[in-house]
């Protein structure tokens, strides 16, 4: 259920550099790896996995387990297309757990057995909460996207837990990270439904959903369906991104193809057919949504502006298309995230009051 494909490492660095340096790695170290990498798939000097893993191992040897986890996260990026990427993910998890005592939060890892297509599947989750978590607080479920997973967005999860003083349940969407099932719209949504039900049992019953990138597809889906009490969609595709009219860039065809479960590069027709079932048009045509906050950068090369602006005019929905930034507004997150935190705080508190 994986395959490598032609991918220019220098182009990936060009696109993801802001994300690399804004999530906790020193600029100089990122620049050193960037200068050393000449091939995406070679597990040898000059190869993406090799050079990022070399940096990660140096951090680990120095006891900087948080940075080691981040660097191994980039080593396995953008998908688990071969054995060396899978090794990097295992090492990322190891370093992440070693870093946990210094998170400044209560951390717990669990593997949930959730309903899936007539059977069950295991879903590893990470629970983060303040040490002095008040009783009777809401719970947030949160995920990254198709190539940046729960451990890769740790910094944002910490902000959510500490600033909102609640428990965050972090997971990988279907087809990514530690998930063992392919990404589909219905199947992935079924797993999210199981996570929502579990989250309602952990706090006061009020649950919010924060989704980043492709994770935003699933938070849009749960928000539009009214399955949660608040939904944040950060850079999520919902409709136009799934049409054949757009061209994939920066290797996104292979990233998505791997997540969908192909074991060899699909044809354009095969990829388009799988993508078509993700459209949220049926839910967009209904009026039963929970309160929603939709945010993205106006210059996103992966998700058309339509997929943000289509939410304008909806009941209980705030839309923010941020100028001068791209996918998930990543270069302006220090400006955008306080808005997200403020909206969540108000919306979840309103839901708590309404439930009393």
Language model segments and positions:
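Short beta-strand/loop motif that positions the catalytic acidic residue
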Residues: 287-288, 293-296
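Hydrolase active-site cap/lid region
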Residues: 221-273, 290
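N-terminal cap/lid segment of alpha/beta-hydrolase-fold proteins
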Residues: 88-132
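Alpha/beta-hydrolase active-site loop
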Residues: 182-202
